[in-house]
Amino acid sequence: MASPFVEVPVDTPTGERVIKVTNPDRTYFAGLPEGRGRKIDLVEYYLAVADGVVRGLRERPTVLKRHPEGADGEAIYTKRVPNSRPPWIETATVHFPSGRSATELCPVDVAHVAWAVQMSTLDFHPWPSRRVDTESPDELRIDLDPMPGSGWAQVQEVALEVKVVFDGLGMTSFPKTSGSKGIHVYLRTRPGWTFTDLRHCALAVAREVERRRPDLATSKWWKEERGERVFLDFNRMARDQTIASAYSVRARPLATVSAPLAWEEVPDCEVADFDIWTMRDRYARLGDVHAAIDVVAHDLSPLLELYDRQGEGEAPYPPQFPKMEGEPLRVQPSRARRPTAT
């Protein structure tokens, strides 16, 4: 028997697309009442926030985080779009240090988003660079990740300290909830910088925030050194590392989303305030509160100068990376300190 389906018309700048949504009543979220959080609900949510979600994805190679068994099932990170894709689907080819390459989805309109949701995509993980030059990122991302023993209140405080650092350099930054436990802070950058440059900028911010608030924040890569603090994950700016885009639905029990915020909202908001229904209402009232994110693109020289002044040099890369130039020994400190047996 053929799977049930509905056809959803989607308006785009190049004409109407029709997305065939199979099994529209399939549910994804165990924490919701029966019949809530269906595939069709996801499609309708993304259509309702179309301009906002596309603003974060447009022309960016994008990894799809798919959950065909539901939000609590195993995630499938899809870097290669299927050959059976419609002819209008846009793609971008990216290359990895291993020498391999992948043809990734490159959304240019909300029909691309709806097509991906049909494949059980919940959230979208775009590169911080665009198709025209994938090796030149234009988006600095600061990822705040609370360690066990720290919580949302600490994340909020650290986010506001990140804002102080950027404000002090005359830079306009944009916060959003991660939709899970943390906060992401974005900054648009001028073209011409490398992934190494942006990672150094993220590392400079992390170290500066830790210097200001050592009780709350840490830039330490090794978990054993972080304590019960909020980790500013500078390695999210390493090449081929991504985070969930603005408006992405997260694989959480209550269908929470990564919610763009105005800075004045950060002290009083909660992650649970924003799900696929409340965000639709909010978007209808306020539109995209990050609509101005592309207005100003920043020169990163002040952040790179801060990195140099700090004088701490490189920090470890994630384990899947080859040894990088200037990187310290990639060994956790407790092991490095072990005395040699005699």
Question: Whereabouts are the PLM-identified features?
Answer:
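C-terminal accessory nucleic-acid interaction domains of nucleic acid-metabolism proteins
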Residues: 1-44, 51-54, 58, 101, ...
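Beta-sheet entry/capping signal
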Residues: 18, 61-63, 74, 172, ...
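Polyanion/phosphate-binding surface patch
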Residues: 60-92
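Class II aminoacyl-tRNA synthetase-like tRNA-binding/catalytic domains
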Residues: 76, 84-115
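Signature for HUH/AEP ssDNA processing cores
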Residues: 105-178, 189-197, 342
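A short beta-strand motif that forms the metal-chelation/ATP-contact edge
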Residues: 184-190, 231-234
